[in-house]
């Protein structure tokens, strides 16, 4: 979908119109172990995205956020190798997470790609700050295009400080300031990690971009243990934002690329000097939001919608229950 300067490509897989894996994305029958399925599928997916962007007068370099889903963590490194062929430098903010399965049989990769075709390319600026730990994947911590700021998904990891200070603990990539002592009952891992991500990582990048936490209009939150951690996440969200929370989506996934991480958060924000207005929307006639955030946030001409499920304060609504 293209709207004004924005381009949104969603659910791009290496499939045909019947949602069957394309022949060029399948390993050769006689040599099944000579090529990786994710490498083959990645070339089809990235070529498709590049083709769409070219048809719109742009390129992959117009990307401001890339969301990648794999069916195995083992596919991350082969995918990254292929990605460098298409974007050898200036890679946009990114998140990459494993999931149990994708909707097309045989698909091991799915990509969402957001781009901004700015009328004036000089308004695009790559955001980098040493106040937040650098990322290992080579992508930008953030990108600002005009009024808009897009940040990469951030976990509580700090790869420069990976050893655990706690006796008896497993190895962890979580930053010391985001850890709780496993030898004590005190503290919440999810709450410590969310607070660290938002204040020490995303907050620092936003400040470098001319923005702040209160200017966030959309947050994508990936949880590896949603049944255990959703309440703790909501506690921190409520404390951070009060009644000015961004539109928030909750995405259950299978893990992260940093040992010990339980959450990853990517955000979209407006700059402090943005001319666009912001409206938080809660609709009284439908079930209240599932967490401490509005149903949606309208920022400029874009509408960002929070997670919506068929539930109210008592659980699943009657009209959504099976008829047996």
Task: Show which residues each predicted segment covers.
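N-terminal presequence-like segments and the immediate start of the first folded domain
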Residues: 1-47, 51-199, 203-217, 224-324
């Amino acid at each position: 979908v293209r709207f004004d300067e924005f381009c949104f490509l969603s659910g791009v897989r290496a499939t045909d119109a019947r949602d069957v894996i394309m022949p060029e994305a399948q390993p050769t029958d006689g040599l099944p172990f000579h090529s990786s399925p994710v490498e083959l599928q990645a070339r089809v997916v990235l070529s498709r995205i590049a083709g769409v962007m070219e048809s719109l007068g742009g390129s992959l370099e117009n990307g401001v956020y890339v969301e990648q889903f794999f069916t195995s963590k083992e596919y991350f490194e082969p995918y990254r190798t292929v990605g460098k062929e298409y974007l050898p430098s200036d890679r946009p903010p990114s998140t990459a997470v494993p999931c149990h399965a994708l909707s097309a049989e045989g698909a091991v990769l799915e990509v969402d790609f957001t781009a901004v075709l700015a009328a004036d390319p000089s308004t695009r600026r790559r955001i980098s700050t040493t106040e937040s730990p650098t990322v290992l994947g080579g992508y930008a911590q953030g990108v600002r295009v005009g009024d808009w700021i897009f940040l990469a998904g951030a976990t509580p990891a700090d790869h420069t400080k990976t050893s655990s200070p706690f006796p008896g603990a497993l190895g962890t990539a979580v930053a010391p300031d985001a850890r709780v002592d496993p030898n004590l009952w005190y503290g919440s891992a999810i709450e410590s990690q969310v607070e660290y991500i938002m204040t020490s990582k995303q907050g620092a990048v936003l400040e470098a971009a001319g923005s702040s936490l209160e200017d966030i209009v959309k947050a994508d939150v990936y949880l590896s243990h949603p049944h255990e951690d959703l309440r703790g996440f909501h506690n921190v969200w409520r404390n951070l934002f009060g009644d000015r929370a961004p539109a928030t989506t909750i995405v259950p996934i299978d893990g992260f690329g940093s040992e010990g991480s339980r959450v990853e958060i990517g955000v979209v924000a407006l700059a402090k000097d943005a001319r666009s207005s912001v409206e938080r929307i809660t609709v009284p006639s439908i079930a209240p939001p599932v967490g401490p955030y509005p149903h949606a946030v309208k920022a400029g001409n874009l509408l960002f919608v929070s997670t919506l499920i068929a539930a109210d304060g008592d659980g699943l609504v009657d009209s959504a229950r099976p008829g047996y």
